[in-house]
């Protein structure tokens, strides 16, 4: 299982310290590789094919050394996807604990997801598949599993409404959950399409007005 990155560890620009990297543990080296990869995906060349030569140069090690930390580039991207899942779903779990009202839960979770996308453009490119266009097809399937899991999370939250609040929805909970995930995917795609000039949390409250009637 890949080591987990926190959002804070993704944000700062990594420093190139090739002279010191050999003193770091394997876990720290893997962390650095993933952090540098994330920032390269964030950069202006983030849509270009990511090569191990380019990544090794930015990390400050040889390609051979890079493969000591990860057996393949595919494994690096798989680790990034696992870290996205860990970061988002841990925050979803926290939101569920802090908020008991279903309407507020869904609102807060959507807002949190869009905030994540805003802060992590490189990872958003992974979620839309743009960063994976030149990689193995199984990575696209792995991202699809992430969205399936997100949809199931929404289904569970919506189904709990009847037990917690004694209320139901005018349409099936799974249909609503599918719409919520599609809404997220659409915002991610627009963010990438506009090269992150349009932030998904801008105008969110106005867009929320189309979702809110489902909870009445």
Swiss-Prot record:
Q: Does the keyword Cell cycle apply?
A: yes
Q: What is this protein called in UniProt?
A: Nucleoid occlusion factor SlmA
Protein family according to the UniProt entry: Belongs to the nucleoid occlusion factor SlmA family.
Q: Which organism is it from?
A: Mannheimia succiniciproducens (strain KCTC 0769BP / MBEL55E)
Q: Which SUPFAM superfamilies match?
A: Homeodomain-like
**Free-text function comment from the UniProt entry:** Required for nucleoid occlusion (NO) phenomenon, which prevents Z-ring formation and cell division over the nucleoid. Acts as a DNA-associated cell division inhibitor that binds simultaneously chromosomal DNA and FtsZ, and disrupts the assembly of FtsZ polymers. SlmA-DNA-binding sequences (SBS) are dispersed on non-Ter regions of the chromosome, preventing FtsZ polymerization at these regions.
Q: What is its main location?
A: cytoplasm
Q: Where is this region: Disordered?
A: 1-23
């Amino acid at each position: 299982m890949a080591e987990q990155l926190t959002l804070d560890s993704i944000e700062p620009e990594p420093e190139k310290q090739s002279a010191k990297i050999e003193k770091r543990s394997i876990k720290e080296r893997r962390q650095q590789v993933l952090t540098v990869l994330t920032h390269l995906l964030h950069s202006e060349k983030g849509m270009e094919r990511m090569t191990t030569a380019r990544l090794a140069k930015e990390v400050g090690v040889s390609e051979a050394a890079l493969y000591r930390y990860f057996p393949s580039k595919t494994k690096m991207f798989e680790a990034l996807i696992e870290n996205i899942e860990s970061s988002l779903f841990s925050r979803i779990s926290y939101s569920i604990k802090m908020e008991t009202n279903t309407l507020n839960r869904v609102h807060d979770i959507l807002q949190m997801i869009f905030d994540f996308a805003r802060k992590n453009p490189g990872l958003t490119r992974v979620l839309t598949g743009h960063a994976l266009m030149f990689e193995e097809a199984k990575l696209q399937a792995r991202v699809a599993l992430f969205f399936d899991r997100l949809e199931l999370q929404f289904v569970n939250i919506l189904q709990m409404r009847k037990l917690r609040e004694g209320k139901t929805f005018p349409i099936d909970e799974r249909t609503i959950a599918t719409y919520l995930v599609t809404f997220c995917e659409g915002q991610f795609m627009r963010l990438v399409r506009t090269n992150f000039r349009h932030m998904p949390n801008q105008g969110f409250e106005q867009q929320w007005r189309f979702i809110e009637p489902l909870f009445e």
